[in-house]
Amino acid sequence: KLIGIVTERDLLFANSKNLIQDVMTKDVITAKSGVSIDEAKELLHNHRIEKLPLVNESGLVTGLITSKDITNNADYPNASKDNKGRPLVGAAVGVKGDFLERSESLLEAGADTLVVDIAHGHSENAISTVKHIKKAFPNCELIAGNIATAQGAEDLMKAGVDAVKVGVGSGSICITRVITGSGVPQLTAVMDCAKIGRDYGIPIISDGGTRTSGDATKALAAGASTVMVGSMLGGTDESPGTVLTKNGKRFKVYRGMASLAAS
């Protein structure tokens, strides 16, 4: 039940020894579940607040609308969201150990799609993992990769994936081709896999080698339905890497998906 709200303003000059009940705002402005965006905007503006808790008839919290939610909704109307208005989220799992338990926990936490994400996706472990996840969670949207051949794409599609991630060694920091001596140039790999994808009605994701807008255009023209980017966004404020400063310039730590640091 809602008894108060704590925002950044409440904590700004608070003593670290203070209890939550001592710093929280107790007289909270609320709205009923199902309030419209326009009604929420009016309440936020009239009361000069930034956060609006939503409560049901029993006073239990059912949601929260913030001023940033409303501005983001207006600024980015085409953002990919779920039926609750939240950004779509994908979560990666491996192919060993407790991947089923991890998959269940991620789906319960609200993940919209799972990704069986390993450096060599055309392997018995990856195919077996796909089959087990789809059997346990048949309604789960499942992506698997990475692969670089038509046969790899077909084997994953037969196993039950909903999308295939294509790209081995093409990423900006990927060394798989160098270490293994195996790989396919990205455009060729996408074209080969897209042919199989069309036969099965399953989309292809081009993952790697997208350093410019032109690279994305080529991947889409070659048959990819989606393009994944890493290095293009790796230095943004929103990316999760640690910030380092070298010679007065700011950098972000950037890791490969199969690196020891990432795992």
Segments predicted by a language model, with ranges:
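Catalytic cores of alpha/beta
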Residues: 101-109, 142, 148-166, 206, ...
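Bateman (tandem CBS) regulatory domains
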Residues: 18-28, 83-88, 108, 136, ...
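Catalytic beta/alpha-barrel core
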Residues: 30-32, 51, 92-94, 112-123, ...
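A glycine-centered beta-loop-beta connector
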Residues: 1-7, 44, 52-68
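Active-site-adjacent beta->alpha loops and helix N-cap segments on the catalytic face
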Residues: 60-80, 98-101, 118-142, 147-158, ...
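Alpha/beta catalytic cores of nucleotide-metabolism and tRNA/nucleoside-modifying enzymes
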Residues: 31-32, 92, 159-162, 181-206, ...
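Short beta-strand/loop segments at the ligand-binding rim of alpha/beta enzyme cores
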Residues: 82-92, 132-148, 163, 196-208
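The conserved cystathionine-beta-synthase
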Residues: 31-48, 55, 71-74, 100-105
